[in-house]
Amino acid sequence: MSGHNKWSTIKHKKGAADAKRGKVFTKLIKEISVAAKLGGGDPAANPRLRTAVDKAKAENMPKDNIERAIKKGAGGMEGVTYEEIVYEGYGPGGAAVLVEVMTDNRNRSVSEIRSIFTKANGNMGEAGCVAWMFSKKGLITFDKGLDFEQLFEAAIEAGAEDVSEEDEQFEVTTDPSSFIEVREALVAKGFSFANAEVTMIPQTMVALEGKQAESMLKLMDKLEDNDDVQNVYSNFDISADEMEKMM
């Protein structure tokens, strides 16, 4: 399995997605509001907002919640100022970790994130210590069952950089600037995607097992549980056999 969606696959298998839906909604509402504040409340003219709204719809967020979040952001979010920060560090076994934070209190966030790293036998590093290990890309995944050759041809024609076949899905990779264009071109041709997002893809992977693997999953869980954290990326890899031992 390719590593860049390893964590999302593990979360799905653990059944964590439904259990934490309320927290997911909270993070999405924050992203929608900030996107609307920065780029306006029209998703058609604001790519960041459009992506956030599409993600919220994919999580089955009620339409009213989405509209309220847009209205709040477009209205200026009086009295609330969020700062976007990326923290970097190392998890167990030297796995690289990127943590995207949206916070109204930088001091609180850095203290909490540092504590989470330390308790999981990791450590928070300086800016730039691991960012170079990742590339920002658009990633569109499709469940198997459709024709790979047709998807490949349509995706490349639409401007995708690569199309690959993984263990459980087909993956279309794009430049971030052409992500929405490629996604909509594929939808227009009848391809229904399982997930679509702009993400950070690691260039190399770090294999973990045993206690290190367990500690890494706990670190990822704790980071995502933090209210200020929007996204977490890592280059760890845990084999299917190792996952079976931990489930």
UniProtKB/Swiss-Prot annotation:
Chief site of localization: cytoplasm
Keyword field: Cytoplasm, DNA-binding, Transcription, Transcription regulation
Presence of the UniProt keyword DNA-binding in the record: yes
Molecular functions (GO terms): DNA binding
A GO term from the CC aspect: cytosol
An example Gene Ontology biological process: regulation of DNA-templated transcription
Subcellular location: Cytoplasm
Superkingdom of origin: Bacteria
Cited InterPro entries: Integrase-like_N (IPR017856), TACO1_YebC-like_2nd/3rd_dom (IPR048300), TACO1_YebC_N (IPR049083), Transcrip_reg_TACO1-like (IPR002876), Transcrip_reg_TACO1-like_dom3 (IPR026564), YebC-like (IPR029072)
Positions of disulphide bridges: none
Alphabetical list of PANTHER family matching this protein: TRANSCRIPTIONAL REGULATORY PROTEIN YEBC-RELATED, TRANSLATIONAL ACTIVATOR OF CYTOCHROME C OXIDASE 1
Family: Belongs to the TACO1 family.
UniProt protein name: Probable transcriptional regulatory protein Ppro_2673
Organism: Pelobacter propionicus (strain DSM 2379 / NBRC 103807 / OttBd1)
